[in-house]
A protein has these predicted regions:
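Conserved mid-core segment of classical short-chain dehydrogenase/reductases
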Residues: 3-4, 104, 112, 127-142, ...
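Catalytic Tyr-X3-Lys loop
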Residues: 134-153, 170, 189-190
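Canonical Rossmann dinucleotide-binding motif of NAD(H)/NADP(H)-dependent dehydrogenases/reductases
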Residues: 34-66
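Amphipathic alpha-helical dimer-interface segment in Rossmann-like NAD(P)H-dependent oxidoreductases
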Residues: 56-57, 108, 112, 147-167
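Conserved glycine-rich Rossmann-like NAD(P)H-binding loop of the short-chain dehydrogenase/reductase
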Residues: 63-78
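Catalytic loop of short-chain dehydrogenase/reductase
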Residues: 26, 32, 125-127, 168-190
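Non-catalytic terminal and boundary segments that flank Rossmann-like NAD(P)-dependent oxidoreductase
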Residues: 1-37
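The beta1-alpha1 cofactor-binding region of Rossmann-like NAD(H)/NADP(H)-dependent oxidoreductases
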Residues: 73, 94-107, 138
Length: 190
């Protein structure tokens, strides 16, 4: 597998459709076996990157998908198109996972429209590179923690009453948590 070249976008969140080359979100050789048939997965940050790849893979396994994303509408629509091309339904829910009320509403909408919730994937995260810790503002620090830590907590809290025995919560993390990065001090600590 080839490495993606380093790319930088000033806008946050970044827009996957503007990346060149485009990241590969699906493996054409992978064939689903129905392991998630009749299940529903809610994936935060499912509009792009790892979240999009998970949404497509889960759809290939038969799961209906709810994608929670901030405001990357075109990326989210592309994910919906890719998921629905596999057969299952794909619900798009735009909002800020750092807002507890939004997380409650996203879970309510998922259960209301897709009938249940079996898998929660806490994948959304944000990072804002800075040259030194002195450049990390209080607002940036709070925003990073609100998305990366509070968002995971709020979404899990909202989902738990709907998850039956045998359901799953998956929390993704970054290698940056283990290796560190001098330009991502706040992100690495989440």
């Amino acid at each position: 597998m080839s490495q993606q070249p380093s790319q930088h976008q000033e806008r946050r969140p970044g827009i996957e459709s503007e990346m060149r080359p485009r990241p590969q979100a699906q493996d054409p050789a992978y064939r689903g076996t129905g392991k998630l048939r009749d299940k529903v997965a809610l994936i935060t940050g499912g509009d792009s990157g790892i979240g999009r790849a998970v949404a497509i893979a889960f759809a290939r396994e038969g799961a209906n998908i709810a994608v929670v994303y901030l405001n990357e509408h075109n990326d989210a629509e592309e994910t919906r198109r890719l998921v629905e091309s596999e057969g299952p339904a794909c619900l798009l829910i735009a909002g800020d996972i750092g807002d507890e009320a939004f997380c409650q509403e996203a879970v309510r909408q998922t259960v209301g429209e897709l009938g249940r919730l079996d898998v929660l994937v806490n994948n959304a995260g944000e990072q804002h590179p800075q040259e030194s810790i002195a450049q990390v503002s209080k607002e940036q620090l709070e925003r990073t923690f609100r998305t990366n830590i509070f968002g995971q907590f709020f979404m899990t809290k909202a989902a738990l009453p709907h998850l039956k025995e045998g359901s799953t919560i998956i929390n993704t993390t970054s290698v940056t948590a283990y290796k560190g990065n001098p330009q991502l001090i706040d992100y690495a600590s989440t």
